[in-house]
Design a protein with these regions (language model features):
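Substrate-binding/active-site clefts of carbohydrate-active enzymes
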Residues: 1-4, 8-138, 169
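Histidine-centered beta-alpha loop that forms part of the nucleotide-sugar donor binding/catalytic region
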Residues: 23, 181, 239
Length: 248
């Protein structure tokens, strides 16, 4: 931690800011903390694995079913009982190769498999909300300037509104950048408190088509106009770790 804080200090001394990647939707399937503070529980450590869904559980469980990886690796020796839902919302015990089978979905109080589908259970507050807020506050206290929030749209906006307001109350300088790919959700997540959102589906995809000669540059104007009311919250980019180099 001393090395980390020294890095932050050097970065700030150079006139730069430090942004940390925050992945709130999922964890690795073999996740476990290796340096957790005294008195802090791992995600899932106190779960009642006999329940598919509970607001007090951090994960979703396929009760009574072991994880079956036959579609991914024919002779896998990996054992998980009961199976946990994957990060891309696969709620059965036999994920496909196209699923995020190496990840586990975090439970923010939405029951995806009830009779009505996606019912919200936000009161009492889900345990995951409190644990993830603690993580944000911990790193904000170390001098982080911003969080880049991975797959933010897969986490309910209600959580973001709660968590970001709490972080900004104590650390008003901290900014939040959300990875939201669905343009119909842009305004919801901005209202929830995000300072900036990726404009991947809009501006990035448009610029890519222009560079490839698939459309005229006038298309850029149309993209701008589609988000004119929220353009100050849109983060435009040419490259990131998920996309090809723009020159290629």
């Amino acid at each position: 931690m001393q090395e980390w804080q020294a890095l932050i200090a050097r970065t700030h001394a150079a006139g730069l800011k430090v942004m940390m990647d925050f992945v709130p939707n999922h964890v690795a399937r073999e996740y476990q903390s290796i340096a957790k503070p005294t008195g802090i529980s791992d995600l899932g450590e106190k779960d009642d694995v006999s329940k598919h869904f509970s607001v007090q559980n951090n994960f979703y469980y396929c009760w009574g079913q072991p994880l079956n990886l036959e579609n991914i690796a024919k002779h896998s020796s990996y054992i998980e009982q009961p199976a946990k839902a994957t990060g891309n919302d696969c709620f059965h015990a036999t994920p496909q190769k196209s699923d995020w089978y190496e990840t586990i979905k975090l439970n923010y109080g939405i029951d995806y498999c009830d009779a009505g589908g996606r019912s919200e259970h936000f009161s009492p507050m889900p345990r995951t909300w409190m644990m993830m807020l603690d993580i944000l506050l911990f790193w904000a206290s170390k001098g982080i300037d911003a969080f880049r929030c991975d797959m933010a749209e897969m986490v309910p906006a209600a959580f973001w509104q709660y968590a970001m307001s709490e972080v900004k109350r104590l650390f008003p300088h901290v900014s939040f950048i959300g990875e939201v790919y669905n343009p119909s959700l842009y305004r919801l997540y901005i209202r929830s408190g995000f300072d900036y959102l990726y404009d991947k589906i809009g501006m990035y995809d448009c610029l890519r088509r222009v560079v490839r000669g698939e459309c005229d540059a006038t298309a850029i104007t149309q993209v701008w106009q589609a988000t004119d009311d929220i353009h100050t919250h849109m983060l435009y980019f040419l490259e990131n770790h998920d996309e090809q180099r723009i020159a290629s």
